[in-house]
């Protein structure tokens, strides 16, 4: 039996009933499309030596990585924004969760090897820095040098992916214990820093805050968290560490954090999770703290699913179930944006990001770095309209589809499920410049593994 046949087997639980005249893609067509996406990701968007994930690469070549010297000099900026190594923790962590599901569904040596390769990249990102709790975004050509700024959007997917990997059955014994210890070391470092995501340079500040969330003092210049994202991510990490370590202290801290009201909030974190989040419509600016971008907040929907599956208390579970359903219904309206993508589009994508150094200036804090990167993005988008095009019509609909699928087969999102399948078969993966389409595998495998979640 071939790999594609194995992948297609059992997909029926994911497919919605469709009339004979429907043009909804069938099981085999979807499975073949996903296998094509998988092959393209491994061909172009994973570092062949270090296993880290690239943001973009030319269809026929490899990306231009920042040199170690450029990383040390903070070029193009300390956040690595607009470079090919901007989102290694973010994309790699979520991709590892999909590869872990892929292995559980088809326990082959090839699937194990693929997951191990991405996991090795995530381990490298956790060990690259010298600051406790720091997760690097990516590494330079030497496999070690990195930009100093991390973020919540890098850190939480790292935890989520490593949790999925450690629960997949791929790693056992001493190897598993070592990786659990690494996760706990990262969490301990964050806890000592009041759950703020530190920069790996003394005095540079932090970028992300799971306790303080958004306030007059915490703004987008310090990576302040929307309340929903901060609450769901913080709770997931605590409960996952309890499940992995068996240490009662993590469970006690989880229950304390779950029931307390953060800062001046009128609601507990559990109540914040139940409300979910109103995503900023794709193609429009985010409005923090209550309307974050759909794609950066999507991993918080995965946090809710993890909490639903790990939480022993039925009352708390019902809150997580409510949040999952609310987010899925809100995201469902954006899945059909895939229709705006034309596979024959030839708009420009500038892969040599070094033109951004013309706007470069020294940075002594995370605030300086955010201001510089915000200035650079205007020129980046002028030179690379194709990048914006793929964000609008590849990234956003696929992340929306993932949010829908993470909630399981729910009546409220039934109309979107046909659009999810059409999105998975719409793209010609080999013509894409960005790696956002890794999310197609997340969508597919979440649909297969979580479709049964029809009851609280």
Task: Identify the function of each model-found stretch.
Residues 230-319, 327, 360:
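Long, repeat-rich segments with strong aromatic
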Residues 100-101, 105, 109-132, 136-146, ...:
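Active-site-adjacent structural elements in enzyme catalytic domains
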Residues 21-87, 116-117, 121-138, 174, ...:
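Low-complexity, Ser/Thr/Pro/Gly-enriched N-terminal "stalk/linker" regions
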Residues 27-42, 96, 112-126, 159, ...:
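Hydrophobic core segments within long, regular secondary-structure runs in both alpha-
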Residues 150-239:
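Aromatic- and glycine-enriched pocket-lining scaffold segments that form the walls
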Residues 23-44, 171-172, 294, 300-456:
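Terminal, non-catalytic domain-edge segments
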Residues 51-84, 131-151, 199-226, 272-310, ...:
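Carbohydrate-binding/catalytic loop surfaces
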Residues 1-11:
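N-terminal secretory signal peptides and thylakoid transit peptides that target proteins
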């Amino acid at each position: 039996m071939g790999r594609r046949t194995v992948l297609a087997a059992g997909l029926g639980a994911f497919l919605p009933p469709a009339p004979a005249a429907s043009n909804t893609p069938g099981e085999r067509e979807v499975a073949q499309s996903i296998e094509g996406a998988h092959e393209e990701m491994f061909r172009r968007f994973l570092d062949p030596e270090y296993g880290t994930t690239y943001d973009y690469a030319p269809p026929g070549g490899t990306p231009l990585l920042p040199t170690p010297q450029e990383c040390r000099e903070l070029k193009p900026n300390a956040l690595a924004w607009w470079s090919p190594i901007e989102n290694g923790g973010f994309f790699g962590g979520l991709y590892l969760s999909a590869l872990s599901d892929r292995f559980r569904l088809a326990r082959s040596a090839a699937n194990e090897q693929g997951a191990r390769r991405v996991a090795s990249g995530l381990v490298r990102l956790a060990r690259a820095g010298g600051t406790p709790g720091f997760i690097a975004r990516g590494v330079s050509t030497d496999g070690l040098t990195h930009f100093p700024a991390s973020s919540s959007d890098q850190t939480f997917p790292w935890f989520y992916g490593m949790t999925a990997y450690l629960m997949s059955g791929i790693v056992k014994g001493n190897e598993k214990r070592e990786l659990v210890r690494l996760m706990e070391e990262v969490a301990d470092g964050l806890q000592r820093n009041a759950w703020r995501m530190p920069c790996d340079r003394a005095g540079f500040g932090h970028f992300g805050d799971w306790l303080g969330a958004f306030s007059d003092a915490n703004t987008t210049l310090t990576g302040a968290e929307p309340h929903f994202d901060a609450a769901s991510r913080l709770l997931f990490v605590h409960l996952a560490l309890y499940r992995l370590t068996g240490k009662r202290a993590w469970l006690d801290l989880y229950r304390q954090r779950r029931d307390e009201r953060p800062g001046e909030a009128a609601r507990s974190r559990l109540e914040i999770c139940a409300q979910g989040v109103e995503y900023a419509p794709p193609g429009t600016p985010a409005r923090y703290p209550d309307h974050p971008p759909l794609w950066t907040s999507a991993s918080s929907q995965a946090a809710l699913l993890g909490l639903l599956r790990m939480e022993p208390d039925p009352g708390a579970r019902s809150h997580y179930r409510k949040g999952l359903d609310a987010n899925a219904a809100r995201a469902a309206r954006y899945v059909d944006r895939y229709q705006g993508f034309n596979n024959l589009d030839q708009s420009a994508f500038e892969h040599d990001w070094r033109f951004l150094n013309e706007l470069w200036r020294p940075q002594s804090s995370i605030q300086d770095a955010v201001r510089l990167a915000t200035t650079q993005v205007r020129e980046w988008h002028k030179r690379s309209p194709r990048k914006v095009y793929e964000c609008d019509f590849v990234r956003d609909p696929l992340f929306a589809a993932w949010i829908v699928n993470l909630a399981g087969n729910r009546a409220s999102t039934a109309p979107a499920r046909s659009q999810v399948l059409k999105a998975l078969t719409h793209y010609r993966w080999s013509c894409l410049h960005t790696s956002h389409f890794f999310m197609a595998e997340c969508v597919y495998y979440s649909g297969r593994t979580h479709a049964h979640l029809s009851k609280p």
